[in-house]
């Protein structure tokens, strides 16, 4: 048991270290390709998304952690996950649709043009789903998959970014935003594939709640 815990800590720690090393190596390269102004806008984009996800979770991510081990059955965990994720999804969908309409009607201004603003809303939604997906992976103590998803997101972001820079003639801020959004989507797909027993909620046993 002790060796298993240490192994999981080591795997997660190794994934974190790899992510940090990738960041240390690639950030200076990216900042040489794009101007500080554009990279600053991208940082604001990412910050907006991170704050929005924290708010839109409504604390249900903590509720998932709190009640996940109450029962060990897959049906209970799937039902719990469904009940924790559905309200943030509903709220975020409604809110992002409303904000999209208000933005495109120029009623509110979110500091970006329409294409970047649209991608911001898409990215927020993807990040929200990914947050719950990776949380379940961690709660299932699947340290290898957890590290794989985190590292692959960073690697996919860089691969997609350099592909866009090399072969597509698009705005550099748009390239950064597209890359991070697609990388998030790919990581989410990995989570859906490997945790499909949790996501495939066919019947809800309301008696459990």
Predicted regions located by residue number:
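Alpha-helical transmembrane segments of multi-pass membrane proteins
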Residues: 51, 55, 89-93, 109-133, ...
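Membrane-interface helix-loop junctions in multi-pass transport and translocation proteins
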Residues: 31-41, 111-112, 140-145, 155-187
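Alpha-helical transmembrane segments of multi-pass membrane transport and lipid-handling proteins
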Residues: 17, 56, 62, 82-109, ...
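Membrane-interface junctions at transmembrane-helix termini in multi-pass inner-membrane proteins
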Residues: 6, 126-149
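Alpha-helical transmembrane segments of multi-pass membrane transporters
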Residues: 20-28, 94-99, 150-171, 186-191
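Interhelical loop/hinge segments that connect adjacent transmembrane helices in multipass membrane
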Residues: 1-5, 144, 169-177, 189-209
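Transmembrane-helix boundary and interhelical linker motifs in polytopic inner-membrane proteins
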Residues: 2-4, 34-38, 52-86, 138-144
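Signature of the first transmembrane helix
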Residues: 4-61, 123, 158
């Amino acid at each position: 048991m002790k060796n298993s815990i240490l192994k999981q800590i080591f795997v997660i720690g190794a994934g974190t270290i790899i992510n940090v090393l990738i960041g240390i190596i690639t950030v200076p390269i990216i900042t040489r390709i794009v101007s500080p102004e554009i990279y600053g806008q991208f940082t604001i984009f990412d910050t907006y998304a991170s704050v929005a996800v924290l708010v839109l979770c409504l604390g249900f991510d903590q509720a998932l952690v709190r009640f996940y081990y109450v029962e060990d059955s897959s049906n209970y965990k799937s039902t719990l996950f469904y009940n924790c994720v559905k309200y943030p999804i509903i709220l975020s969908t409604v809110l992002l649709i409303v904000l999209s309409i208000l933005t495109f009607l120029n009623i509110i201004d979110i500091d970006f043009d329409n294409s970047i603003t649209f991608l911001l809303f898409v990215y927020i939604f993807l990040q929200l789903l990914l947050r719950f997906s990776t949380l379940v992976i961690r709660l299932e103590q699947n340290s290898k998959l957890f590290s794989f998803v985190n590292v692959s997101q960073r690697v996919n972001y860089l691969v997609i970014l350099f592909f866009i820079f090399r072969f597509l003639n698009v705005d550099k801020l748009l390239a950064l935003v597209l890359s991070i959004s697609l990388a998030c989507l790919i990581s989410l797909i990995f989570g859906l594939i490997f945790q499909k027993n949790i996501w495939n909620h066919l019947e809800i046993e309301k008696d459990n709640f």
